[in-house]
């Protein structure tokens, strides 16, 4: 586990974005942990979040020309990641996001920010069913741009209804790499380091055995 990944887990725990216990997911599965990125909801939270996204992007080595944040949750993520790349990595890159509803006056259209072109890095909080990614791909392809990759905060590394995860489906369908700041693997490694959190380790491991990819 890299230092920024450990720091991100601690940041998520401190904001109660990441919780351990027993939770029922939308899929009906009982999960021993829950991640709600919507609780990163202050200026300082967003500034820090952008630094973690930027770190993961630089670490990945993937080449891209523009950041795209799908409405709605992806919008602040793309914005803060663009700021962090410029301030901390000397990479001043354009960013763009979409509107859910096309504007009929003024500048018009359903895209805001830089022109959507070149190699696009899509940033979002998580991938659950991959629906938002598919909708974004239609927008990206309509502009003649290419998807360079997808970056999310957490990869749960678990199967969907079939034998592979929603993330693996996205990688298969669009031929792109999906990267994340952390995965279930790092969460387990973190729990293994923390004796005071040992009570959660067995249930998280059991969950991985049942649903892991």
Swiss-Prot record:
<keyword id="KW-0328">Glycosyltransferase</keyword>
<comment type="function">
    <text>Catalyzes the transfer of a ribosyl phosphate group from 5-phosphoribose 1-diphosphate to orotate, leading to the formation of orotidine monophosphate (OMP).</text>
</comment>
<dbReference type="InterPro" id="IPR029057">
    <property type="entry name" value="PRTase-like"/>
</dbReference>
<dbReference type="GO" id="GO:0000287">
    <property type="term" value="F:magnesium ion binding"/>
</dbReference>
<feature type="binding site" description="in other chain">
    <location>
        <begin position="72"/>
        <end position="73"/>
    </location>
    <ligand>
        <name>5-phospho-alpha-D-ribose 1-diphosphate</name>
    </ligand>
</feature>
<feature type="binding site">
    <location>
        <position position="128"/>
    </location>
    <ligand>
        <name>orotate</name>
    </ligand>
</feature>
<dbReference type="GO" id="GO:0006207">
    <property type="term" value="P:'de novo' pyrimidine nucleobase biosynthetic process"/>
</dbReference>
<comment type="subunit">
    <text>Homodimer.</text>
</comment>
<dbReference type="GO" id="GO:0005737">
    <property type="term" value="C:cytoplasm"/>
</dbReference>
<dbReference type="GO" id="GO:0046132">
    <property type="term" value="P:pyrimidine ribonucleoside biosynthetic process"/>
</dbReference>
<keyword id="KW-0808">Transferase</keyword>
<dbReference type="InterPro" id="IPR023031">
    <property type="entry name" value="OPRT"/>
</dbReference>
<feature type="binding site">
    <location>
        <position position="105"/>
    </location>
    <ligand>
        <name>5-phospho-alpha-D-ribose 1-diphosphate</name>
    </ligand>
</feature>
<dbReference type="Pfam" id="PF00156">
    <property type="entry name" value="Pribosyltran"/>
</dbReference>
<feature type="binding site" description="in other chain">
    <location>
        <position position="26"/>
    </location>
    <ligand>
        <name>5-phospho-alpha-D-ribose 1-diphosphate</name>
    </ligand>
</feature>
<feature type="binding site" description="in other chain">
    <location>
        <position position="100"/>
    </location>
    <ligand>
        <name>5-phospho-alpha-D-ribose 1-diphosphate</name>
    </ligand>
</feature>
<comment type="pathway">
    <text>Pyrimidine metabolism; UMP biosynthesis via de novo pathway; UMP from orotate: step 1/2.</text>
</comment>
<feature type="binding site" description="in other chain">
    <location>
        <begin position="124"/>
        <end position="132"/>
    </location>
    <ligand>
        <name>5-phospho-alpha-D-ribose 1-diphosphate</name>
    </ligand>
</feature>
<feature type="binding site">
    <location>
        <position position="99"/>
    </location>
    <ligand>
        <name>5-phospho-alpha-D-ribose 1-diphosphate</name>
    </ligand>
</feature>
<comment type="similarity">
    <text>Belongs to the purine/pyrimidine phosphoribosyltransferase family. PyrE subfamily.</text>
</comment>
<dbReference type="GO" id="GO:0004588">
    <property type="term" value="F:orotate phosphoribosyltransferase activity"/>
</dbReference>
<dbReference type="GO" id="GO:0044205">
    <property type="term" value="P:'de novo' UMP biosynthetic process"/>
</dbReference>
<feature type="binding site">
    <location>
        <position position="103"/>
    </location>
    <ligand>
        <name>5-phospho-alpha-D-ribose 1-diphosphate</name>
    </ligand>
</feature>
<dbReference type="InterPro" id="IPR004467">
    <property type="entry name" value="Or_phspho_trans_dom"/>
</dbReference>
<dbReference type="InterPro" id="IPR000836">
    <property type="entry name" value="PRibTrfase_dom"/>
</dbReference>
<protein>
    <recommendedName>
        <fullName>Orotate phosphoribosyltransferase</fullName>
        <ecNumber>2.4.2.10</ecNumber>
    </recommendedName>
</protein>
<keyword id="KW-0665">Pyrimidine biosynthesis</keyword>
<feature type="binding site">
    <location>
        <position position="156"/>
    </location>
    <ligand>
        <name>orotate</name>
    </ligand>
</feature>
<keyword id="KW-0460">Magnesium</keyword>
<feature type="binding site">
    <location>
        <begin position="34"/>
        <end position="35"/>
    </location>
    <ligand>
        <name>orotate</name>
    </ligand>
</feature>
